[in-house]
């Protein structure tokens, strides 16, 4: 009996250790984790001068190390050079704390959290301490709310802090937007995404490069709620999600897109894959769409692989490029877009 009991205890401890080991990983997919480490090593090899990666010498648990590895593997080079490692480690720890303390944290899929909560950068803004500042201010405000209602409440908070005013092309940081109390749509959406991510809510900035019905462009926010992405106007609170002044224009839009740091393997159509980010097409969230396939041939009728194909929308008295593609070995490329007119060049 004693031997049997000891054997059962050892088996239980072994299983518990295995579970803890899996739970300790920030990236549980071994193949993806290996890819992240390989990409990080490649960056380190190309940036040997200085101590840009010295933060990895600090004590970290497995979860923190893997999260930091993901950030450093795919963040812009300027961020690695301009901001210290302690800054990114503090952001990582705050993000993991939010996932632990917020009631919805345990229900957010690993991939969604990795790509739409962990990253600090939203656009081309200066990075700041907003993740830590916003978390301290917002965690009590969303306490006891569902994920759906928390998104609405955070947007109300954003409206209290920032209102719309046109500005220049330089995107202000989230804390700078609070200090000025205004921002254009790209700044309001950057600010709102930062606020949502601070309390562990997956969020992304959405752009239509050019409207189909009028000149100019627009930016807003999508938040992930219980398995689905919902849109809303940044700093423009409404009583429900999927409602904004731009509902009708967006339903006629030709293209909506967002950029996702890292090698993203979601369900959305990939428009462009770079070493650092994945640009995805999310037009299907807004209206009726159709997929067009283009075949590139030379004057002799032969297919042309690796040809650059531009999809353009007429706006501001010009044909503006909203998507760049490359033809495959068959000379073909495709794009899903709203139903309307485009020039393919």
What are these regions (language model features)?
Residues 1-27:
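Bacterial Sec-dependent N-terminal signal peptides
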Residues 19-151, 198, 225-229, 249-345:
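N-terminal accessory/pre-domain segments preceding catalytic cores
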